[in-house]
Amino acid sequence: MARLLLALLAWLAQMSPVRAAGSVRLAGGLTLGGLFPVHARGAAGRACGQLKKEQGVHRLEAMLYALDRVNADPELLPGVRLGARLLDTCSRDTYALEQALSFVQALIRGRGDGDEAAVRCPGGVPPLRAAPPERVVAVVGASASSVSIMVANVLRLFAIPQISYASTAPELSDSTRYDFFSRVVPPDSYQAQAMVDIVRALGWNYVSTLASEGNYGESGVEAFVQISREAGGVCIAQSIKIPREPKPGEFNKVIKRLMETPNARGIIIFANEDDIRRVLEATRQANLTGHFLWVGSDSWGSKTSPVLSLEDVAVGAITILPKRASIDGFDQYFMTRSLENNRRNIWFAEFWEENFNCKLTSSGGQSDEATRKCTGEERIGQDSAYEQEGKVQFVIDAVYAIAHALHSMHQALCPGYTGLCPAMEPTDGRTLLQYIRAVRFNGSAGTPVMFNENGDAPGRYDIFQYQATNGSASSGGYQVVGQWAEALRLDVEALQWSGDPHEVPPSQCSLPCGPGERKKMVKGVPCCWHCEACDGYRFQVDEFTCEACPRDMRPTPNHTGCRPTPVVRLTWSSPWAAPPLLLAVLGIMATTTVVGTFVRHNNTPIVRASGRELSYVLLTGIFLIYAVTFLMVAEPGAAVCATRRLFLGLGTTLSYSALLTKTNRIYRIFEQGKRSVTPPPFISPTSQLVITFSLTSLQVVGVIAWLGAQPPHSVIDYEEQRTVDPEQARGVLKCDMSDLSLIGCLGYSLLLMVTCTVYAIKARGVPETFNEAKPIGFTMYTTCIVWLAFVPIFFGTAQSAEKIYIQTTTLTVSLSLSASVSLGMLYVPKTYVILFHPEQNVQKRKRSLKTTSTVAAPPKGADTEDPK
């Protein structure tokens, strides 16, 4: 296979002598090859296009300048002169390959095995012998990575070392495929790392990439994507490739695609300067000036040509360029070049015409008045603008790297020998490669020049930003804002942006979540998320997690943490406590007045007729009902909670037991009187008291058993007022009584109340002589209404934020109202008569015979029901 390839290359070398003639030749003992993009890529089938003044001519002249200096240095390669064969690649890899075949012609002919003897001319004339081609020992170039790759595949077959001054594709670091390739510029893998560091330093996490088709653009983007994936925190929205031969409207489509992900404002661009310029033009046409945030590779660097007349679109662009310096010696050399002293450069005349916008010779036809004739006296830098091209330093360093390697090789193989010794004729490429990889010297800019095992130079970059000057983009320029050498040093404060000059614009898939929000990641896109509020009682633990606060805590207003839930209770000063306390105080005062009046007039007919014993029991129950209000408002504690359990139902039980006993006695007397004159049993005062206290004892025994089974204590209930809005949440300090326990505590007395009401209904037909039957009935009816109203109010506020206040107030007011009804209907009228109408407090005449005969006489010693 190798023999077949060599035969093919030999044939191509023989077929391309004409094209190879367009070159710069310098005679020398050792010849270096050079590849430079003197012309741009041609259009419409042409191999070469317009002259490239800076990238082509400047770089080619830099090699000539370096060779002059090496040959003039008596300490470097003494007695050995370096020659050169410099070729134009026309910025096209296939054309460069054809040109590079001239570098291997001598080697191919050396392997020709007597092919020349087989050449016969017509008539037996011997063939003309052409001058033998130079034996190229090393090659400087090429510029574009695609060209270097194409040429490297050929040079390695003939063991010719190659050093590039501008090719940065990571692919060229593969020493198994490009083992004879080296470069004095760092590979794009370093550049890609620097660009990833820049993106991260700016806080961007969502960017798109844009690459020119070819090794440089595609390899650079691939390296950026891989490094960003390994580093994490940066996602690629889109990776767009610009075709090698873009069609009309292609760049408008590129901008349209970039706008499909408008949040990815950061655009990582690995493209040639022509593509960069057309991307900027399409951006302006789409009226998107200021939207995209460009991060350009070294192909953009600090060049003015891509941004000329497009400065407003380029403002804010961050670009990267291998660390370099302007070489003053080259400036002096180049600005003194003229048509007279630079005849060795066959393209210099074309450069002269292009640079000074003139013509050296007039055409045979009608002359163009707009183009003047060159005088030859023009001066570079005086009659035309001049700025040293950015890769000049690296061209000089590449030449010196080969020179230093040859010098070391000469010292090792030809010690004490001036000129070339037989050991270096011919020069072995593999041995030279070893010396090239071992060189270490200070280059033209004073920075160290060296190579690693893959032939790569260390990564050292300057970081630029294109900034407006005094608010004018057209007068702006590139400013150094940082450096990168294994680590990024970026002066963020020196950056300027459109809009707010000092605020870094975002390039993020999703905006940062606010306080109290967590990131809900989008599946498959680690840099995109939705912000989800930590609502309710949840708080933000970290950027991805919400958790519920402990039960005794509630979230802070911004849901970034938890804080203790306030504890509340019904206090003496609370507005909710005022109405029940007022009713209780008035009720106690009224009850005390009634009791005092009854005691003072204990033997008067009205007091005796009301049933003194049960009246005092009933009044005691009413007093206890009013007193419960103070227990319900008091601060909960073990003693208060125990007292609440005991007295909450005791007062009502005592009252309703007494009323039930009374109504039952009246009903039994009335029913018994219908059948006989014999009085019913258990209607004496003692019997009535025994029945009342027996009924009450059931409540007391039940409460005592409850106290023993579940000792009372206070609790803080955080669920009672755990409202939807955490800001309204409260912990309620209360006794350990649930709503059902409270109803259970009152349930027995309510049962007595219902039973009493039933007897009151049954006794509604009792004759007027039993003057308490109807008041008791009205009392029970009203009490039932009060408690029926209590139930929906009490349980209907279970979810209210004011539950503790409403329920306590409702309960105490209901108790006080029921007590007031009993007091008002049964005893206030009697007290009024006793105090204000004593003349009515006398025993009336005996009942009529008819009435008396139908009602059993009370037992001896009992209080009687006197007629009105």
Swiss-Prot record:
Glycosylation sites: 287, 442, 470, 558
Topological type in the membrane: Multi-pass membrane protein
Keyword Transmembrane in record: yes
Protein name (Swiss-Prot/TrEMBL): Metabotropic glutamate receptor 6
GO terms under cellular component: dendrite; endoplasmic reticulum membrane; Golgi membrane; plasma membrane
Keyword Glycoprotein: yes
Molecular function per GO: G protein-coupled receptor activity; glutamate receptor activity
Similarity comment text for this entry: Belongs to the G-protein coupled receptor 3 family.
Renumbered residue ranges of the record's region Disordered: 845-868
Quaternary structure annotation from Swiss-Prot or TrEMBL: Homodimer. Interacts with GPR179. Interacts with photoreceptor synaptic protein LRIT1 (via its N-terminal extracellular domain).
Positions on the Cytoplasmic side per record topology: 600-613, 665-688, 762-774, 837-868
Name of a matching Pfam family: ANF_receptor
Tree of life domain: Eukaryota
Gene name as annotated: GRM6
Membrane-spanning parts: 577-599, 614-634, 646-664, 689-709, 740-761, 775-797, 811-836
Location(s) in or outside the cell: Cell membrane; Endoplasmic reticulum membrane; Golgi apparatus membrane; Cell projection, Dendrite
One GO term of the biological process aspect: G protein-coupled glutamate receptor signaling pathway
Disulfide bond entries: 48-90, 235-527, 358-374, 414-421, 509-528, 513-531, 534-546, 549-562
Annotated signal sequence range: 1-20
Chain residues that bind L-glutamate: 145, 166-168, 216, 298, 391
Keywords: Cell membrane, Cell projection, Disulfide bond, Endoplasmic reticulum, G-protein coupled receptor, Glycoprotein, Golgi apparatus, Membrane, Receptor, Sensory transduction, Signal, Transducer, Transmembrane, Transmembrane helix, Vision
Extracellular side: 21-576, 635-645, 710-739, 798-810
Biological role stated in the UniProt entry: G-protein coupled receptor for glutamate. Ligand binding causes a conformation change that triggers signaling via guanine nucleotide-binding proteins (G proteins) and modulates the activity of down-stream effectors, such as adenylate cyclase. Signaling inhibits adenylate cyclase activity. Signaling stimulates TRPM1 channel activity and Ca(2+) uptake. Required for normal vision.
